[in-house]
């Protein structure tokens, strides 16, 4: 008798957090696709122990769980390039969720190659930006992989439905129908969405904040700190050399204590709608403030102004999920050139939600007191300004003469 050939089960790698959405996706994938589910949890500095997820993932039906410590790679390869670029989305958002997704997707693709998986799955909803960020990264890194996005397929239409689905299958979830906030946390930030925040008229409750306090509840005494940068990268705090993750964690603690980095905004999502989010980014706000101050001291006018223009495009690329792209790499090359002399020390004052400059110095400073002084000086001939003004204003003068001659004025 011929032995019947056993066809191996196809595999899918799931971006797994242990939260509501990804918890119910495991049984759903098995029930609807018949795939073996391999879960991957990324440690990006969520501030929680991920080891307990092993038991939960297996009980939910996964064959195995990868727990990947990506914190240092996250800071050095994703956060620091964005910081050096000065990228801020719509003037407020420091992109904490945006640049985390391409890194997670990158590791999913690597595990899929190792396991021989044919598909990647994620728990992003069909209304959000994360679905785009995950899938663009996968397409850029391995276009042969199938992508499964359950929220765009299944009959579950709300978080309440998802909770019911989980309860039916005995899967514990950390969300209740009474407080259905969606939170995303990593070493850079903590975001809050959903629930009563969906009405932009509602002020965030004080107990919402987890990384810090409301500014009015911050200490009544200011705190000063000094940050040292080398070529645009922060390397030490108050004279002490710290690793990338430790530095950011320390700044989060100090900044959070003083209510630094709380942003409440209505933003334009890539998928066409507006959404309201409350973000806590204490350490990131401190780093952006310090880095910008040092750039203003060390970059010439033309470079600084042009860099501010490309910062807008860089922020759009990161927000839109186009991290793995030739344009982003090209912009990085430009930014790296601008950062060669962004080295020095910045002193900041933290007080009740405010992070203000209290001093800046650099061996590459372009500020010259001799030229800038309003007192007596011997290096600047003020008479030279007349010729400059005449030439710079010539187009305006010619136009005014033409309008006068033609009777337009």
Swiss-Prot record:
L-citrulline binds at residues 93, 98, 129, 133, 182, 191, 267, 279. It comes from the Bacteria. ATP binds at residues 15-23, 42, 123. It catalyses: L-citrulline + L-aspartate + ATP = 2-(N(omega)-L-arginino)succinate + AMP + diphosphate + H(+). The keyword RNA-binding does not apply. Homotetramer. L-aspartate binds at residues 125, 129-130. This is Argininosuccinate synthase. InterPro entries: Arginosuc_syn_C, Arginosuc_syn_N, Arginosuc_synth, Arginosuc_synth_CS, Arginosuc_synth_type_1_subfam, AS_cat/multimer_dom_body, Rossmann-like_a/b/a_fold. One of its GO terms (biological process) is urea cycle. Pfam families: Arginosuc_syn_C, Arginosuc_synth. CDD domains: ASS. Its EC number is 6.3.4.5. Pathway: Amino-acid biosynthesis; L-arginine biosynthesis; L-arginine from L-ornithine and carbamoyl phosphate: step 2/3. The keyword Kinase does not apply. One of its GO terms (cellular component) is cytoplasm. Belongs to the argininosuccinate synthase family. Type 1 subfamily. Keywords: Amino-acid biosynthesis, Arginine biosynthesis, ATP-binding, Cytoplasm, Ligase, Nucleotide-binding. It is found in: Cytoplasm. GO terms for molecular function: argininosuccinate synthase activity; ATP binding.
